[in-house]
Amino acid sequence: MSNTKTKTPAKASARKRRADAERSIASIIDAALEALAIDPDASMAEIARRAGVVRATVYMHFPTRESLLDAVMEHAVGQVAEATSGAEPTQGEPEEALERVLRATWHKLSDFHTLLAINTSRLPASELHRRHEPVMSLFVPLIERGQEKGVFRSDLPVAWHLAMVRAIAHAASAEVRSGRIEESSVEDALIATALNALSPS
């Protein structure tokens, strides 16, 4: 009986510490996204300041800048994957579904132009591809369905179509970030380019 009483407060305390740590990590990741959007070279000290914590707290959770960038990237990919999935890629006619999904994906991706540029420069192409898999895998059934219905090219493998869509989206992001193209005009161009490339005619 006494053992139960002594263990319960300890478990509650451990849960509180975990919850506090999770909140701290979330605030640091949010702060990193804000800071990096303004300055790709933002320091750990600046990120700590924005998160409202001391620098030691940032290093406690993320021992290196690379580990923080990895966590921020994982968070961003999760956000984009959620938006992509929420657009219901398995519903409707393939062409309409692709347009709907690309719009949803682009709307969320547009929050992360600078982060995408940072990761493109720091990671090998193969690693960048692997980390984007949670998003790109959602396009596979959609493209396969379009090929089966004859509205998407079937003479090229799905992997090629995925690489093409990813490359167009990344190029669009780079153009917006450079200021060469207005973001308001990119979305329709992105979708038209992807649909034209996939069309068998």
Question: Residues of each region from the PLM?
Answer:
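Short hydrophobic/aromatic patch on the recognition helix
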Residues: 52-62
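Hydrophobic/aromatic-rich alpha-helical bundle segments in the mid-to-C-terminal region
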Residues: 116-121, 125, 129, 133, ...
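Hydrophobic alpha-helical connector segments
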Residues: 71, 82-110, 124, 187
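Basic, helix-initiating cap at the start of DNA-binding domains
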Residues: 1-38, 42-50, 67
